[in-house]
Amino acid sequence: MEAKTSGPKQIQPSTPAPPPSTRRPRVREVSSRFMSPVTSSSSSAGDLHSLTCNSPKQHHLQHHQIQRSVSAQRLRRQLKMADGDENRSSETAARSLDSPFTLSQSRKSSKPSHLKPLNENSHRLETPTPMVPPPPSRSRLSQQRLPTATRLLQLSGISACYEKEGIINIQEKPKSNGSDQFPTLSCRTHLKVFNNPVPSSLNRSVSSPSSSCNVRESSSFSRLGLPLPPMAPKVPADTKKQRKVTEQLEDVHSLKLLHNRYLQWRFANANAQVKTQTHKTQTETMIHSFGSKISELHDSVQRKRIELQRLLKTKALLAITESQTPCLEQWSAIEEEYSTSVSQTIQAFSNASLRLPLDGDIMVDSKQLGDGLVAASKIVDGITQNVGNYMPKAKEMESLLSELTRVARSERSLTENCVVALLKTQASQVLNLSLHKLKNVL
């Protein structure tokens, strides 16, 4: 074992001692897993074996943890054997305890390089700090106090529990930041264990032994009269789930509000559509009634116009015949007189012819016969003169009667044309009303 530890000591270059620091040494922050005795390997391995689950992934993880715990115990033995060696720096010992790798790998990792920022506590990135070797006085002080603290914790019997917690923290611990030069178990590591999104089965498997370790730790500290170490605040592991649940509830509530608003708008649109439809039907019925009334008024107007034209024609005819009515009245009276006179003349001629003797000796007075013939000729001349006087009036009356018949014929033709025009107007009016209704419907 000494040969193994002397090999890395010869390879490590000597570093210049920095100026002494006035900072208080961080002895309380030394993790308990570095102070556990060598005999605690079986107990820690047994406890870790009890945390295994039925799944193959968790079994492989626990097997890897047991291998790391064995390597950490070997490094602790090397540290105890090389405790009196002053050439071995405290930083190398602390790094060898903190990591499960060899001392050469820890020495390679301690070289200055570009460090990746840590992501812990709600995935917040921290700026990396350069690694500064601790002062010699501080390393010596930590080497002196380390065995005493180890003895105290061996007496209390709580090193096994801290070793289990240390194994869990080794699995989840990121690369070294360089700000802490001692292998400490800070509160940030505990917070990262709670906040790290590891599977829930591993958290459940780790929770039961940690609670028993806390009970034994409190009882051991109460027996020794030492103050209890500060407990890390428990951060709920399901904050993200709660946040997601609240966001989902808010989304559901907003969707419900939007759905209610959509239903309100649909109801308003449907109500407005129904009102518009009723108003449209009422307007259509009113327009139809108005159209029927307008058609009736149009028919009455056409009838009135026809009657007016008829009255105008009658008035013109009356104006023409009104001047001829007195002549017609006189003609009736003259016709009666002339008819009576003609009848009397005929009777006188017949009487005179009957008085002539037809047999025996007839004696005729020529003078009386001549006087009778002269009187008869005078009567006939008067009759012919009167008839000649009434002949132009009769011709004029004949022309007027012919003109009256012609006007009556034209009136009859105009009446027939008016009937045809009325039929055409009615058909066009019906077509116009149907077109208006079709336009309103569209």
Swiss-Prot record:
InterPro entries, per database record: QWRF
Pfam families hit by this protein: QWRF
Motif position, QWRF motif: 264-267
Skewed-composition ranges (Basic and acidic residues): 80-89
Top-level taxonomic group: Eukaryota
Chain intervals with Basic residues compositional bias: 57-66
Region (Disordered): 1-144, 221-240
Family: Belongs to the QWRF family.
Name by which UniProt lists this protein: QWRF motif-containing protein 6
Source organism: Arabidopsis thaliana
